[in-house]
């Protein structure tokens, strides 16, 4: 059991209580909760995650960053499969845990290119993105984008953040005057 392993590895950690919340007995999804307490007289240390340098592996991300962003993110990257994450400072070692996301999902490394994630568009400020297609709040183009349709822009800038009133809501890839929609399919409106 993960909790027992954690307590065995961390002196001063004591399991107070644990509970499984079954989905058929509560309203909502099922969960597991454990209350662990550090004894006052014990020093409970948490190992920090060691990240290896990924200079060669993230070359395509760095190219994307140079071409489409106005910032350089620090080198706290983790690669899981083809998914690239920006890991928070002082992130504990979670190697033995099943983790859904290791931090900010930057995007996916594909053959000879990087495809930015929806989360990255929400993380960045508009001034940190080189190309922003701004849409006014009363413009019907917003609904075209949210439905997953292409938008005619008349430009060919590559990756562009689509923003409403200056707030980025997602990505599009612009080529030959058309912005191809990269808004996540699960978030698109269907009416």
Regions found by a protein language model. Give the residues of each.
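Polybasic, low-complexity RNA-engagement segments
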Residues: 39-191
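Core SAM-dependent methyltransferase catalytic element
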Residues: 21-50
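Functionally constrained cores in energy, signaling, and assembly domains
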Residues: 2, 19, 28-31, 125, ...
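A residue-level signal for beta-strand positions that form part of recognition/binding surfaces
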Residues: 12, 18, 33, 83, ...
């Amino acid at each position: 059991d993960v909790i027992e392993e954690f307590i065995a590895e961390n002196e001063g950690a004591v399991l107070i209580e644990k509970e499984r919340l079954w989905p058929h007995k509560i309203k909502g999804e099922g969960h597991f909760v454990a209350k662990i307490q550090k004894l006052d007289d014990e020093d409970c240390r948490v190992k920090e995650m060691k990240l290896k340098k990924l200079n060669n592996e993230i070359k395509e991300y760095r190219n994307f960053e140079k071409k489409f962003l106005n910032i350089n993110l620090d080198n706290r990257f983790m690669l899981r499969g083809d998914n690239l994450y920006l890991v928070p400072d002082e992130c504990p070692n979670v190697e033995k845990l099943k983790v859904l996301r290791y931090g900010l999902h930057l995007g996916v490394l594909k053959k000879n290119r990087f495809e930015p994630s929806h989360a990255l568009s929400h993380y960045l400020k508009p001034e940190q993105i080189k190309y922003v297609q701004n849409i006014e709040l009363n413009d019907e183009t917003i609904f075209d984008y949210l439905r997953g349709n292409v938008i005619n822009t008349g430009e060919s800038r590559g990756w562009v953040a689509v923003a409403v009133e200056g707030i980025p809501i997602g990505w599009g890839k612009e080529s030959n005057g058309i912005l191809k929609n990269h808004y996540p399919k699960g978030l698109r409106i269907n009416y």
